[in-house]
């Protein structure tokens, strides 16, 4: 009998999984005195929304304490924790079974030890051929109606990414699978042209990369994002881009052309100025210094650029708000927005695992503040508050951000894009030219 690698261990017996209990709170835990902020570049920061400091909300209870201890027990279990050598250069520290899978996988020691170390997990690119490429959005707190995701998953490996749970739709984990199994859509530009030619199509700003970073490392090879921009430029179609990659500067030639026609704006996500923290949170994204340099290059090229301080993680990077905004303003950013940490579905457990690995002494404090801002829960998906939270801590974060943004002139919200220039792409006839 030949020895099997540890990453190919047999499955244990199926373990039944309970259905998800994530439901929106019908009351929303909203007070008219609490601030509401949006990370969107189109949403104004309303000074009048800041009222008196809200009363203290729910505190860190017994359920939360048990969740913290459960995370510690999980990370002490070698059948759950992925070995450090295997996840070198990755953000997630675990790879739990997808929430829609009927059975839960658990590793076990079969006695076939191997002496050599297993190599780090490679990135696998899976080609996907979707039938459509524009996704419609009807969430009232998201100020774009359409989006395009050139990829599924993201190699940047940001530990906090709210899009991680979407990998469950592919039967995969929101942990390491999300950053090692990337789905690429090479026919995206072709589909986009077809959809823009539809007789009933109405142009509105398309968000490029709502659930993935359009300039993640695999874009260097596949160039799907650039092909999409080429179509949008020819059609004079407005687009908004969110990225934390310096690769966006590769397309300055296209973006400059679109900026001249008021068709593009770019938001650079900057979560910290500390390179050590960045390596832990977002190991394959550009360094903070590189992102600030990207802001400078885009601004000097005449491309409207804003900065997103997103997410703000209690007790981890919340002390950097003012410093990030100041550095961004000096680099040439024109606007700024923020989002409080969001932990939908199994992301809450992934975040606890990450904290146990990197900041075990802060685990309880992080979730104490987060639950205070989420009505006593790890996450509240209520549309009116999911971006900014509620309660005293959320109020304080909003007030600090607004004050700094106003002082630095980053609260103008003046990057409106044109849609009146749109012209549908010409339909190819399939006939050869005579000349």
Where are these regions (language model features)?
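Flexible, acidic/Gly-rich N-terminal and inter-domain linker regions that tether
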Residues: 1-146, 416
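Peripheral terminal appendages
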Residues: 17, 34, 428-435
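Conserved Radical SAM active-site core
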Residues: 110, 116-152, 156-267, 271-279, ...
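Short histidine/acidic/glycine/proline-rich micro-motifs that form metal-
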Residues: 213-215, 311-315, 387-388
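Short, electropositive alpha-helical surface patch
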Residues: 222, 256-270, 317-334, 395-399
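Short, hinge-like loop/turn segments at secondary-structure boundaries
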Residues: 258-260, 284-285, 324-326, 353-357
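Conserved C-terminal portion of the radical SAM core fold
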Residues: 289-349, 365, 372-373, 403-407
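C-terminal accessory regions of radical SAM enzymes
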Residues: 349, 355-433
């Amino acid at each position: 009998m030949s020895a099997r690698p540890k990453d190919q261990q047999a499955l244990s017996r199926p373990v039944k999984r309970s259905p998800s209990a994530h439901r929106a709170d019908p009351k929303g835990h909203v007070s008219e005195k609490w601030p509401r902020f949006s990370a969107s570049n189109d949403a104004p920061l309303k000074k009048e929304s800041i009222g008196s400091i809200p009363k203290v909300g729910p505190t860190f209870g017994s359920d939360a304490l048990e969740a913290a201890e459960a995370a510690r027990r999980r990370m002490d279990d070698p059948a759950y924790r992925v070995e450090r050598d295997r996840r070198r250069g990755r953000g997630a520290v675990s790879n739990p079974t997808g929430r829609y899978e009927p059975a839960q996988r658990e590793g076990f020691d079969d006695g076939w030890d191997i002496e050599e170390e297993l190599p780090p997990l490679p990135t696998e690119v899976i080609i996907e051929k979707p039938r459509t490429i524009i996704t419609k959005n009807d969430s009232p707190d998201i100020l774009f109606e359409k989006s395009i995701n050139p990829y599924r998953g993201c190699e940047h490996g940001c530990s906090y990414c709210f899009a991680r749970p979407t990998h469950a739709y592919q039967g995969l984990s929101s942990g390491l699978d999300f950053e090692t199994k990337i789905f690429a859509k090479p026919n995206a530009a072709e589909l986009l042209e077809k959809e823009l030619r539809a007789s009933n199509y109405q142009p509105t700003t398309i968000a490029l990369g709502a659930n993935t970073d359009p300039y993640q490392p695999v874009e260097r090879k596949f160039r799907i994002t650039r092909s999409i921009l080429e179509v949008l430029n020819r059609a004079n179609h407005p687009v908004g881009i969110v990225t934390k990659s310096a690769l966006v500067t590769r397309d300055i030639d296209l973006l400059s052309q679109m900026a001249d026609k008021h068709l593009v704006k770019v938001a650079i996500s900057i979560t910290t100025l500390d390179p050590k923290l960045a390596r832990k949170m977002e190991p394959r994204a550009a360094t903070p210094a590189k992102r600030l340099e990207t802001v400078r290059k885009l601004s000097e090229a005449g491309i409207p650029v804003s900065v997103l301080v997103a997410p703000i993680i209690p007790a981890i990077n919340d002390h950097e708000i003012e410093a990030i905004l100041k550095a961004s303003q000096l680099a040439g950013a024109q606007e700024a927005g923020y989002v409080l940490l969001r932990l939908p579905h199994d992301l809450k457990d992934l975040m606890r695992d990450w904290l146990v690995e990197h900041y075990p002494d802060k685990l309880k404090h992080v979730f104490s503040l987060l639950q205070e801002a989420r009505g006593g829960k790890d996450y509240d998906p209520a549309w009116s508050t999911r971006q900014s939270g509620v309660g005293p801590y959320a109020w304080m974060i909003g007030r600090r951000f607004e004050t700094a943004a106003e002082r630095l002139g980053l609260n103008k919200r003046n990057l409106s894009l044109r849609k009146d220039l749109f012209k549908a792409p010409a339909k190819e006839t399939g006939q050869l030219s005579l000349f």
